[in-house]
Amino acid sequence: MGRMHAPGKGISQSALPYRRSVPTWLKLTADDVKEQIFKLGKKGLTPSQIGVKLRDSHGVVQVRFVTGKKILRIMKAMGLAPDLPEDLYYLIKKAVAMRKHLERNRKDKDSKFRLILVESRIHRLARYYKTKSVLPPNWKYESSTASALVA
């Protein structure tokens, strides 16, 4: 699949393990993994940060293979899911940082152009999440209130 605002094709990606069964050397059960997700979610970590932490320190290759559910679904069941989807949150955070930069550097034309691209990605992603009912239908991105969303 091609990139949205770049000429690259985006063919590089991580390969999923061939076998979808739980490795024999993994001593954690599904309940142990869910408990770890609960603890890390309480600390305020995002689903991808939780996945990295479980992979690096506990040896859980794919949470879905062990528990049968993805991390975000487990967090939703426990009531720990973030109110904004993670990718949208980080795009808004990037746009807020770019606006702050543009306040200090008014003549930075390239950053102004890149901000337009980032905000168009935000609008496109928000439209997708509204159709999937992840966001409420009246949710709207506004640059004036964006810093409050990511604070």
Curated annotation (Swiss-Prot):
CDD domains listed in its UniProt record: Ribosomal_S15p_S13e (cd00353)
Gene Ontology CC annotations of this record: cytosolic small ribosomal subunit; nucleolus
Recorded GO MF terms: small ribosomal subunit rRNA binding; structural constituent of ribosome
Annotated keywords: Ribonucleoprotein, Ribosomal protein
Pfam families: Ribosomal_S13_N (PF08069), Ribosomal_S15 (PF00312)
UniProt keyword Methyltransferase, yes or no: no
UniProt-listed GO biological process terms: translation
PROSITE patterns listed in its UniProt record: RIBOSOMAL_S15
Family indicated by similarity: Belongs to the universal ribosomal protein uS15 family.
Protein name: Small ribosomal subunit protein uS15
Species the sequence originates in: Choristoneura parallela (Spotted fireworm moth)
